[in-house]
Amino acid sequence: GHVLSHNSGALRLLGVEEPEGEVNVLVLNREEPFRQAVDEVLSGHRSQQMLRLNGRCCQLLANPVMQGEEQMGAVMVLLDVTEQEQREDLRREFTANVSHELKTPLTSISGIAEIMQSGMVKAEDVQGFASDIYQEAQRLIALVEDIIRLSQLDEGAVNMEREDVDLFQLSLEVTKRLESAAQKNDVTIKTMGRSVQVHGVRRVLDEMIYNLCDNAIKYNRRGGTVAVTVGPVEGGVEVSVEDNGIGIPAEDQNRVFERFYRVDKSHSKDISGTGLGLSIVKHGAALHDGQIRLESTPGKGTTVTLLLPQG
């Protein structure tokens, strides 16, 4: 079949120059899916194929053009569906990760309950088994709450009521709530700086600071410190959370804000958490037109800084 007409968008996706004169359609592309679509449509059948063209994911739709019973030609349409495919890949990955994260505590709960149901547990051990079930149930609740929160931030469904928030005071409240967790890990947590105002969603700002501090405690060392510093800077206000813990390798630093991403998976098994905390920080920063800066040296510690517009 020969090309009767085309547009520049199709040529751009195919990565070919403007053809001179009448050319065979297969000159444009000789990949098997393209050839199959041409064969099918010239035989009077509709065809739909997926193509990889110059790093882009494209959908090829081909339909015969009929006049009565006679086929007069065919129309082929190329659609760039790269972004849709990327979103679908992210959705599949997210679903797989959620399924795995849900299965782990559920398996533990089921196993413990089965042992208790069988009557194999001594009376003095029941309290310990019940405590294990409670801890796994709390882990499930935290995971579900984080998934819901992340979904709300994704869709902009968070209660968007904004107010003036003193970030220094908010940071003091957050570190106060985390003092017990810090003590259990032999970590000292402190807040420094002065009052600065932002106009934002208090609950989201609270969660952002909490998640950063919580991570700094969990991935710290015995006798370590977590320092939260709040203050004005050129262009807005900053909240930085600095620890002297295990640090993050350079190759992982661009990925730590991805959902469920764990830097050291073997070490992370011993650390509680949903794997969604930093992703919530990332989405919360975007909600407030803010920026995130991460600096880390393995073995020395990590500093995560939030830059937010001043209220």
Feature map (PLM): residue ranges:
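Short acidic helix/loop segment immediately C-terminal to the autophosphorylated histidine
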Residues: 117-124
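Conserved glycine-rich
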Residues: 289-290
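Conserved micro-motifs of the catalytic ATP-binding
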Residues: 155-160, 193, 197-203
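Short alpha-helical segment of the dimerization/phosphotransfer core of two-component systems
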Residues: 135-140
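Short conserved segments within the C-terminal catalytic ATPase subdomain
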Residues: 181-196
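PAS-family sensory/regulatory modules and their coupling/dimerization elements
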Residues: 19-83
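Short conserved segment of the HATPase_c
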Residues: 248-262
